Curated annotation (Swiss-Prot):
It holds the Pfam family AAA_33. Residues 162-196 form a coiled coil. Residues 82-110, 127-161, 182-204, 542-574 are annotated as: Disordered. GO terms for biological process: blastocyst development; in utero embryonic development; negative regulation of hematopoietic stem cell differentiation; negative regulation of transcription by RNA polymerase II; positive regulation of hematopoietic stem cell proliferation. This is NEDD4-binding protein 2-like 2. GO terms for cellular component: nucleus; transcription repressor complex. Keywords: Coiled coil. GO terms for molecular function: enzyme binding; transcription corepressor activity. Residues 563-574 have a biased composition (Polar residues). The lineage of its organism: Eukaryota, Metazoa, Chordata, Craniata, Vertebrata. Residues 129-141, 149-161 have a biased composition (Basic and acidic residues). It comes from Rattus norvegicus.
Length: 574
């Protein structure tokens, strides 16, 4: 310890000096052989033996450093004592102290087994603990790690920026290539321009190729091609009605000037040279107007309705050119995959012209876009057809044997529209006192029902539902003619019941007692395939066989002509 106090006591002859800590002297104020403490904490008291058991006391100040000019009187006093007791340990101690004083150097601290010392100063480590060094090392390591991490992040950020720049460059190059391809396509499309013929010009079927204008120009339809027709169809006069970029052809004779509607055109329709398609039951059928209408045909009235994209406002009773021999090929026909159904029941193809129909198509130069354009054309055509169907008036012809469920079906269809109406030839035989059938009145009953339907069509009622058996096509021809003349759309509907062709079940379900035998005869004459073309090409039989009326009232009404028995349809229910 750097600072200590030593107190010496004489214990008697032959005893060694003992050292006590300074704190012991505080306990007793008077102690034998102990002098009052003089000096600071650095002073030591030394007691030596003498002849009278008294020791001279020399006060020695132990300091770490002793000034050279310090007073050395104490050293001179101690020298004789050293000579008298050379072997004494106290003398050794005195000699050591004297030597230390002479040299001016601090006295070395006594050993632990001889001197007990205490310190009033704080006992603790002189130097900083090693933990601080470790903390500094950790801080240095953390700083080094942070610097390394920041450098690594900067490198990653630079790599990411370089990759992003490469991707942006590739994208810009890709967009440039796409733009170049689009410009090339536009340039190739610009080579085909749509001709604009005059209003008085007529085109034959071999000149029927319309071209598509480039993008940016107007897409208005500039020409409608005319053709010579193999037979006299109805003429569809057109008016200015927008059809959402749908190409609508018109069929007319070359003796009339071409019409130029104002709606826009995008997709082509090509008229087929193959036979017309056949349709079944619920398929929608449309037909054109006669070729030579009265002069009023060219003035579209307000009640004219849009038929297959064109306004139809004409009607003519004469169908002299239509014979079964010429057009019976239309009876059975399946629509091929590349034929698009047209609005009036005809299909369209990309081949040459036949049967007096002209070909209308776009001039498309890029074969890589054919598939995409074909899909767009089909979707656009379906959407346009649905839109036209909603705008047009509707004539529904129900077909089915007695008891098959026609009346129930008519009620369902009638409930879907507020302005609809149902007509049945069988209503003629309903009286206030009940139902009375008279075969001699069968012709009058048909005329009466047709007149009612015509009045409803003239008034614009829709849908007009004809609830007759309509087993054969010629029975429906008067209704189809008057409907097409007023721009109505024509549909054929049959009840979808499992017993509709089962004579035994039909006998049980019909309300007027029609026998199973009569129902079987009607089923033998039933024409399953039905379409507009079949109806318009049908002819009423010239030879009519008569039958003797049966006694039963339910069978008596079937005793008329072969042709009329199917038209006198009973309002059946199930």
């Amino acid at each position: 310890m750097p600072y200590s106090e030593i107190e010496a006591k004489f214990l008697g002859p032959g005893k060694e000096l003992t050292r006590e800590p300074c704190y012991k002297k505080l306990k007793s104020a008077v102690d034998d052989g102990v002098f009052p403490h003089r000096g600071g904490p650095d002073s030591h008291r030394i007691q030596e033996k003498t002849k009278n058991n008294r020791l001279p006391v020399a006060t020695i100040n132990f300091r770490r450093r002793v000034c050279p000019g310090e007073d050395k009187t104490s050293t001179d006093v101690l020298k004789p004592l050293h000579k008298e007791m050379p072997g004494d340990k106290v003398g050794g101690t005195e000699s050591i102290g004297s030597q230390a004083l002479q040299d001016g150097k601090p006295l070395a601290p006594a050993r632990d087994d001889e001197i007990y010392s205490t310190s009033k100063a704080f006992i603790g480590p002189i130097y900083k603990p090693p933990e601080k060094k470790k903390c500094r090392e950790r801080k240095n390591e953390t700083a080094t790690f942070n610097n390394t991490d920041s450098k690594r992040r900067q490198e990653e950020k630079q790599k990411f920026n370089s990759k992003k720049l490469e991707i942006d460059t590739e994208l810009s190059q890709f967009y440039k290539e796409i733009e170049e391809l689009e410009n090339e396509n536009e340039a190739s499309q610009g080579s085909c321009k749509e001709p604009e013929p005059s209003q008085e010009q007529t085109l034959s079927h071999d000149q029927a190729c319309n071209t598509l204008k480039p993008e940016g120009e107007s897409k208005d339809l500039s020409t409608v091609l005319q053709s010579h027709c193999g037979y006299q169809p109805y003429l569809e006069d057109e008016s200015d009605y927008p059809c959402d970029e749908q190409l609508i052809p018109a069929f007319c004779d070359t003796s009339f000037p071409s019409f130029r509607p104002e709606w826009q055109s995008v997709h082509p329709f090509v008229i087929p040279h193959d036979p017309l398609p056949s349709f079944n039951y619920f398929n929608i059928q449309r037909f054109g107007a006669p070729l030579h209408p009265p002069p009023s045909v060219f003035h579209a009235r307000d009640d004219a309705r849009l038929q297959s994209g064109c306004y139809i406002d004409s009607y003519q009773d004469g169908w002299s050119c239509l014979t079964l021999d010429q057009n019976d090929e239309y009876a059975n026909y399946d629509v091929p995959g590349n034929v698009h159904p047209f609005g009036n029941g005809y299909g369209v193809q990309d081949d040459s012209v036949k049967n007096g129909f002209c070909e209308i198509r776009e001039c498309w130069q890029d074969p890589s876009m054919d598939m995409h354009n074909e899909a767009d054309r089909f979707v656009n055509q379906c959407f346009q057809e649905d839109r036209l169907n909603k705008l047009q008036k509707l004539l529904i012809l129900l077909r089915g044997l007695p008891g098959s469920g026609k009346t129930t079906l008519s009620r369902i269809l009638l409930g879907q529209s507020r302005d609809g109406i149902v007509f049945s030839t069988d209503d003629y035989f309903h009286h206030q006192d009940g139902y009375r059938y008279n075969v001699n009145q069968l012709g009058d009953a048909h005329d009466w029902n047709q007149n009612r339907a015509k009045q409803a069509i003239d008034q614009g009622r829709s849908p007009v539902i004809i609830d007759n058996t309509n087993t054969q096509a010629w029975e429906m021809k008067p209704y189809v003619e008057m409907a097409i003349g007023k721009g109505y759309r024509v549909e054929f509907h049959e009840p979808e019941t499992w017993w509709k062709f089962d004579p035994e079940e039909l006998e049980k379900r019909n309300k007027h007692g029609v026998s199973r035998k009569k129902i079987a005869q009607m089923l033998d004459r039933y024409e399953f395939q039905m379409s507009i073309s079949i109806v318009m090409n049908s002819v009423e039989p010239t030879q009519k066989s008569t039958q003797t009326p049966l006694p039963l009232q339910g069978d008596q009404r079937w005793g008329g002509s072969l042709g009329s028995h199917s038209q006198v349809s009973i309002t059946d229910d199930y």
